[in-house]
From Swiss-Prot:
One Pfam assignment: TIM
UniProt-annotated location(s): Cytoplasm
Gene: tpiA
Single biological process term from Gene Ontology: gluconeogenesis
UniProt xrefs under InterPro entries: Aldolase_TIM (IPR013785), TIM_sf (IPR035990), TrioseP_Isoase_bac/euk (IPR022896), Triosephosphate_isomerase (IPR000652), Triosephosphate_isomerase_AS (IPR020861)
GO annotation, cellular component aspect: cytosol
Record organism: Bartonella quintana (strain Toulouse) (Rochalimaea quintana)
Protein name per its UniProtKB record: Triosephosphate isomerase
UniProt keywords, alphabetically: Cytoplasm, Gluconeogenesis, Glycolysis, Isomerase
GO molecular function (one): triose-phosphate isomerase activity
Pathway(s) of this molecule: Carbohydrate biosynthesis; gluconeogenesis; Carbohydrate degradation; glycolysis; D-glyceraldehyde 3-phosphate from glycerone phosphate: step 1/1
Functional summary from the UniProt entry: Involved in the gluconeogenesis. Catalyzes stereospecifically the conversion of dihydroxyacetone phosphate (DHAP) to D-glyceraldehyde-3-phosphate (G3P).
Taxonomic lineage from the root: Bacteria, Pseudomonadati, Pseudomonadota, Alphaproteobacteria, Hyphomicrobiales
Length: 254
């Protein structure tokens, strides 16, 4: 944790969830709106097909909603794509950009990520920007070179603590059940914090840095209590309210 930075817990449902899943979303919202809510902010990034329905279902709740990706243009001949303005209109306040699955499967470069962040800002969305190394890059001692390239290339000038959240997600930990030690996470988050302070000054000191990569109830306390970790980006464990809220409950003990 970092003093004076309100924690942020984000869930990424990826390509999971239908209308029936709104029950889980309501349960998450109910838990967040209870006495837990004042301890942190919570966000669920649902599939685009659910966003408008979820926004209507959760009207007046404390749970934030977000998209999982957006195009770098505001409109145009891009079959199948979704703009940041469309996400905003459907009820999103945030959007995940640069997730490792987008960087690898869809070959999204840092320049594309940067352009998408600017598109998110134009629409009034907060950009949740993901960075992280592969297993090969870690074993080759290239972690900090990779992070430097991603941070410098993916974040436009004008980033502030209000329009950007950064998530460190080691690619080798995502969906594998394996997560780095708290010492490794602390080292990386300290590096990211230093980079943000050097470039963005006071805003860099206030930016929320999340950890993402096989976060689950069994390791949440260790990860969320790590220095410079201001929350989590949760994948599979965000699909069930009981798992997501168990992770959130860690903030009662910190």
């Amino acid at each position: 944790m970092s003093p004076n930075i309100r924690p942020f817990i984000a869930g990424n449902w990826k390509m999971n969830g239908t209308v029936e899943s709104l029950g889980e979303l309501r349960a998450i919202a109910a838990g967040v709106s209870s006495d837990l809510g004042h301890l942190f902010e919570a966000l669920i990034c649902v599939p685009a097909t659910l966003l408008s329905r979820a926004s209507d279902a959760l009207s007046g709740e404390n749970l934030l909603l977000g998209g999982q990706n957006c195009h770098f243009d505001d409109c145009g001949p891009y079959t199948g794509d979704i703009s940041a303005f469309m996400l905003k209109e459907a009820g999103a306040s945030h959007v995940i950009i640069g997730h490792s699955e987008r960087r690898t499967v869809y070959q999204e470069s840092d320049a594309i990520v940067c352009a998408k962040v600017q598109a998110a800002w134009r629409a009034g969305l907060v950009a949740l920007i993901c960075v992280g190394e592969t297993l090969e890059e870690r074993t080759s001692n290239k972690v900090f070179n990779v992070l430097t390239r991603q941070l410098e290339g993916s974040l436009p000038d004008g980033a502030t603590a209000e329009n950007v959240i950064i998530a460190y997600e080691p690619v080798w930990a995502i969906g594998t059940g394996n997560s780095p030690t708290s010492a490794v996470v602390a080292e990386v988050h300290d590096f990211i914090r230093h980079k943000m302070c050097s470039r963005f000054g006071d805003d860099g000191r206030k930016m929320r840095l999340l950890y993402g990569g096989s976060v689950k109830p069994s390791n949440a306390f260790e990860l969320l209590s790590t220095v410079h970790v201001n929350g989590a980006l949760i994948g599979g464990a965000s699909l069930k309210a009981i798992d997501f809220l168990t992770i959130c409950d860690v903030y009662r003990k910190l």
